[in-house]
Design a protein with these regions (language model features):
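Short amphipathic alpha-helical segments, especially helix-boundary/capping motifs
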Residues: 15, 100, 125-128
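Residue-identity detector for threonine
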Residues: 52, 70, 88, 106, ...
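Juxtamembrane "helix-exit" motif on the non-cytosolic side of transmembrane helices
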Residues: 52-62, 114-128, 156-157
Length: 167
């Protein structure tokens, strides 16, 4: 559990660093691709933080079972995959209103948390004694597919990225 938690914290720090780097370098970008990904990692990292705190042994969310961290993990991965896909639309244009993306990400984050914690409408991902649910398994395939699809515009428009980014 300690190793897993350390790896989770490391990934959260990396997500925060990606956001900080992209945000502070935004005026130097010729397009909005990296900035969009950077902003999305702020939200992905926050969900990952809540995911890490949601483990049973942490005691932060009493009354929840092992489904909660699994739901949060899937929510973060969906957000991450969809952000990589959406970012490809900014390969040939600047992101002129990054605060709008921040506001949109905040709304998405709030809706995700409401669906998991308050409305409890987010599909179950893990059932104690049974294991992973079909939704969680299908989600992993769907997430992988979206990430693969996101590679296509990147390879077609790789000239839109700075040569050092392509290395």
């Amino acid at each position: 559990v300690l190793f897993h938690s350390l790896v989770e914290v490391f990934s959260i720090v990396i997500a925060g660093a990606i956001f900080a780097l992209a945000w502070n370098a935004r005026r130097y970008f010729d397009n909005g691709y990296i900035l969009f990904i950077g902003i999305s990692f702020l939200f992905v990292g926050f969900i990952d933080l809540i995911h890490t705190l949601a483990y049973k042994g942490m005691g932060v969310y009493p009354g929840y079972n092992s489904d909660l961290p699994t739901q949060l993990w899937i929510a973060a991965r969906w957000l991450q995959a969809l952000a990589f896909f959406a970012a490809t639309f900014f390969l040939d244009r600047k992101l002129n209103r990054p605060l709008v993306v921040l506001a949109g990400g905040t709304v998405v984050l709030i809706l995700l948390f409401l669906s998991i914690f308050y409305w409890q409408t987010f599909p179950s991902c893990f059932v104690e004694g049974t294991g992973l649910t079909p939704f969680k398994i299908a989600s992993e395939y769907g997430i992988s597919l979206i990430l693969l699809i996101s590679i296509v515009p990147l390879t077609k428009k790789k000239d839109k990225l700075h040569p050092r980014v392509r290395q």
